[in-house]
């Protein structure tokens, strides 16, 4: 699939997704999914988090991995990965895996950032989930929000979008509610994963072990570097697209920090 075709499809999907969320309560993120040759699969998850005084990120990653692994379609296998300050700020993606990082990425307007890399066929080939400690006061004010953001950013790397975008509670971490019930997946999230992964593909991206190096421009991304072209914005999030230099695309979804929400659209 050519990049321009993917970009056009993404913009179209963004419009369709907004309608779909309201009308059908489906919340798959366009058609994004990992390619697999089996009905269910294991997704290796690299832990590049460290605990701080505001949030115990390694513990929250463990909780999120356990919750998401209740799905009949995927199982998260978490392993430790380099977690120096520099490495976490770069949070370079690793092919065939998702990487989870926390760092002080700066007062750039985002609380969490989920990024997926689509290969030339439009399948997810790697992903990252970042939590921004520059807004650590958010975690202090509402400890549940740290678990909420961790769970949601990881969910995006599977191809899930939001259950609601108006701040109402769906008792799911895939909403934007501050409810203490919105810290983990619910039945609808698991059902949506069954729908997304109801078919198999001719190859697997979660099994890949090598690929061209992640572009330096993306590896150095700390929030101040442009995320690409803004293709969609809502009250609580924004979506950006950037070419990856090898025939695919990076799709970046930004969870806006308090005070940066779009009140008027």
Annotated model-derived regions:
Residues 2-54, 222-265:
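Disordered inhibitory propeptide/activation segment of secreted metzincin zinc metalloprotease zymogens
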Residues 45-57, 134-145, 176-183:
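Second-shell loop/turn segments in exported
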Residues 57-166:
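Metzincin-family zinc-dependent endopeptidase catalytic domain
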Residues 140-204:
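The catalytic-center signature of Zn2+-dependent metalloproteases
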């Amino acid at each position: 699939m050519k990049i321009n075709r993917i970009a056009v499809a993404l913009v179209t999907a963004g419009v369709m997704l907004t309608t779909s969320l309201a009308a059908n309560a489906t919340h798959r993120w366009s058609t994004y999914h990992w390619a697999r040759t089996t009905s269910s699969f294991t997704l290796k998850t690299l832990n590049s988090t460290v605990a701080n005084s505001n949030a115990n990120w390694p513990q929250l990653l463990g909780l999120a991995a356990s919750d998401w692994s209740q799905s009949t379609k995927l199982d998260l296998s978490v392993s430790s990965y380099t977690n120096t300050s520099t490495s976490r700020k770069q949070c370079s993606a690793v092919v065939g895996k998702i990487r989870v990082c926390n760092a002080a990425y700066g007062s750039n307007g985002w609380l969490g950032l989920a990024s997926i890399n689509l290969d030339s066929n439009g399948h997810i080939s790697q992903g990252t989930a970042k939590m921004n400690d520059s807004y650590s006061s958010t975690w202090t004010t509402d400890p549940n929000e740290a678990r909420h953001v961790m769970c949601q950013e990881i969910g995006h790397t599977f191809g899930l979008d939001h259950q609601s975008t108006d701040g109402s509670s769906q008792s799911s971490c895939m909403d934007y509610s501050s409810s203490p019930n919105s810290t983990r997946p619910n039945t609808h999230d698991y059902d949506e994963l069954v729908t997304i992964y109801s078919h198999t593909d001719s190859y697997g991206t979660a099994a890949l072990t090598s690929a061209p190096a992640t572009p330096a421009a993306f590896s150095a991304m700390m929030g101040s570097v442009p995320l690409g072209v803004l293709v969609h914005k809502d009250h609580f999030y924004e979506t950006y697209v950037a070419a990856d230099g090898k025939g695919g695309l990076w799709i970046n979804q930004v969870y806006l920090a308090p005070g940066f929400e779009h009140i008027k659209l």
